[in-house]
């Protein structure tokens, strides 16, 4: 498939989770609130705001967070969309200054994809026994020359799994600086070649 990187994803921008309806511009969210809370009384305001905080299209529309200045360096004036409150911690300037940032990790992933045809053309196979695993997604990509093992932890927990091939495998990329083989840390992503 074709990978997509949405604006802000390359620096780890998050959903804004604005607390008040007035913080949103998305008419779909605003209209849904009024319809379900005010008109039909199907939901209370607090429950609906939790839903909007997660699902509003405004989450994908907040201004790009360029730096930690007012309005995140996006504008000299109040932008139409509110700036995500975490812009001082998550912004382009900070990402470019950190060699271990998400930005540089994405660059390494893109470089790996361009340099290894197995990633785009290799055969996919779920690692046997991984079908029922609710914490780890592990699969291989294989062509005539190369086999890759991809291990992804989708949880905030440290998980232990044993993969026989790791003894002879070379770690190509990880979002942690060190490799603990069978220990897969929270949200860890590792790619091995063997």
Language model region names:
Residues 143, 165-166, 185:
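Flexible, charged surface loops at secondary-structure boundaries
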Residues 179-194:
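C-terminal beta-strand-rich structural cap/linker in extracellular carbohydrate-active enzymes
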Residues 68, 173-176, 188:
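Residues at the C-termini of beta-strands that transition into short coil/loop
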Residues 1-148, 154-159:
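Loop/helix patches that line or flank the sugar-binding groove of alpha-linked glycan CAZymes
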Residues 149-153, 171-174:
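Short, hydrophobic beta-strand segments that form beta-sheet elements in well-ordered domains
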Residues 137, 166-168, 188:
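Residue-level detector of intrinsically disordered, flexible termini
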Residues 158-176:
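Beta-strand-rich binding/interaction modules
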């Amino acid at each position: 498939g074709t990978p997509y990187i949405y604006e802000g994803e390359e620096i780890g921008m998050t959903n804004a989770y604005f607390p008040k309806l007035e913080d949103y511009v998305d008419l779909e969210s605003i209209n849904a609130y009024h319809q379900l809370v005010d008109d039909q009384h199907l939901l209370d305001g607090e429950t609906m705001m939790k839903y909007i905080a997660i699902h509003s299209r405004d989450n994908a529309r907040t201004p790009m967070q360029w730096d930690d200045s007012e309005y995140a360096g996006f504008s000299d004036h109040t932008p139409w969309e509110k700036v995500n409150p975490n812009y001082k911690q998550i912004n382009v300037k900070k990402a470019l200054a950190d060699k271990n940032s998400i930005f540089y990790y994405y660059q390494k992933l893109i470089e790996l994809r361009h340099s290894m045809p197995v990633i785009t053309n290799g055969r996919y196979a779920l690692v046997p026994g991984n079908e029922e695993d609710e914490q780890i997604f592990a699969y291989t990509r294989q062509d005539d020359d190369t086999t890759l093992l991809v291990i992804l932890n989708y949880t905030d927990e440290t998980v232990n799994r044993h993969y026989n091939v790791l003894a002879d495998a070379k770690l190509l990329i990880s979002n942690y600086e060190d490799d603990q083989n069978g220990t897969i840390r929270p949200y860890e992503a590792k790619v091995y070649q063997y």
